[in-house]
Amino acid sequence: FALNLAFNGEGVASPQEAALALAHPGPERVLLAFVAGEPAGFLCGLLKRSACYSRPSAEVTELYVCPGCRRQGVARQLLEAFLDACRQEGVEAVTVLTGEDNAPAQALYQRMGFSPSGEAHFEQGL
């Protein structure tokens, strides 16, 4: 909960809501990383199956590493673990959305083989 709150701010799932979601897993995968026995970061990702495509797809929806644990390979390890899980599920491609101004994240994704998709991202608040 504390890592999610630090990353996303107000409006995050409460510890009870998160526990309920984790107790009834759906397409979401949540990975935690620890450094010296303390939570250091997390990755949330979705494995998506569609009636339109023969192979599942996946998306990294959240990736956060505590400031004091950055530049130690934590994000890379989380991402590698998620990519391995995706390969085991038959996923052919993984997408990730990050801020245009988040140069460190963009550099990480590019080092790990991701490339800009050229697709426009649209959102409508409800």
Model-assigned labels for residue ranges:
Residues 1-55, 61, 66, 79-80, ...:
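Acetyl-CoA-dependent GNAT
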Residues 5-6, 69, 92-93:
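Short, contiguous strand/loop micro-motifs
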